[in-house]
Amino acid sequence: MLSKQIPLGIYEKALPAGECWLERLRLAKTLGFDFVEMSVDETDERLSRLDWSREQRLALVNAIVETGVRVPSMCLSAHRRFPLGSEDDAVRAQGLEIMRKAIQFAQDVGIRVIQLAGYDVYYQEANNETRRRFRDGLKESVEMASRAQVTLAMEIMDYPLMNSISKALGYAHYLNNPWFQLYPDIGNLSAWDNDVQMELQAGIGHIVAVHVKDTKPGVFKNVPFGEGVVDFERCFETLKQSGYCGPYLIEMWSETAEDPAAEVVKARDWVKARMAKAGMVEAA
């Protein structure tokens, strides 16, 4: 019987670095998490996962079965380096190939949701042409995802093109495809001049998961919980009252900390306390 508890997960980059997924999932289980979100970022090391052999993919599946800790989502931030909106055809082609490989990887290992980075370009100057190419790239990507039955979900970003749920909904309406949805980050959403609660309500019906982190205006990473501007209790209340029942993912970058597990436990307890105040069922 499926649990009615709220699924609470941890980002891979919060845990000690390394390629042994059995160890990582065992640690996540010990720390009380239901799932781990995989990162495929712009580094060669993590990008190489998309070229894993059949045996390496099977090892991940076996680790999931052995531990009972799922890997249901992938944070695909590699498109910073290979953006779908690039005016360099070769770079854009690499971006689309990364998307194809990520979707195939997800299909092979049971990942259900690929979180997309909402950058038309990241290291270059954006313009109308980069935005057009980005839209076309998303359209092509969603067609691939549809065939594989893998959901692509847009993150609310630290970047003006996709810094609100309202803007991301524009792409959802443009693509008009059930395999394209939203994966908001309440930290990023709160760091901009957004009516956060109204934005969350607007996204209901399209939100497939929620990133949980603290931020300050202009500071989108490594803000300790409780030291930023995010009103977690109100965000959790709004999502609960709006009928959202999906997973929450604590996003941290403590993999290089002296004691990553201790940092994660501290964050986990802080977040769960805010969830309890919001009247949500505590995650295990």
Curated annotation (Swiss-Prot):
Its EC number is 5.1.3.22. Gene3D superfamilies: Divalent-metal-dependent TIM barrel enzymes. Keywords: Isomerase. Pfam families: AP_endonuc_2. Pathway: Cofactor degradation; L-ascorbate degradation; D-xylulose 5-phosphate from L-ascorbate: step 3/4. It comes from the Bacteria. GO terms for biological process: L-ascorbic acid catabolic process. GO terms for molecular function: intramolecular oxidoreductase activity, interconverting aldoses and ketoses; L-ribulose-5-phosphate 3-epimerase activity. It catalyses: L-ribulose 5-phosphate = L-xylulose 5-phosphate. Induction: Induced by L-ascorbate. Repressed by UlaR. It is an enzyme of class 5 (isomerase). HAMAP family: UlaE. Catalyzes the isomerization of L-xylulose-5-phosphate to L-ribulose-5-phosphate. Is involved in the anaerobic L-ascorbate utilization. Belongs to the L-ribulose-5-phosphate 3-epimerase family. This is L-ribulose-5-phosphate 3-epimerase UlaE.
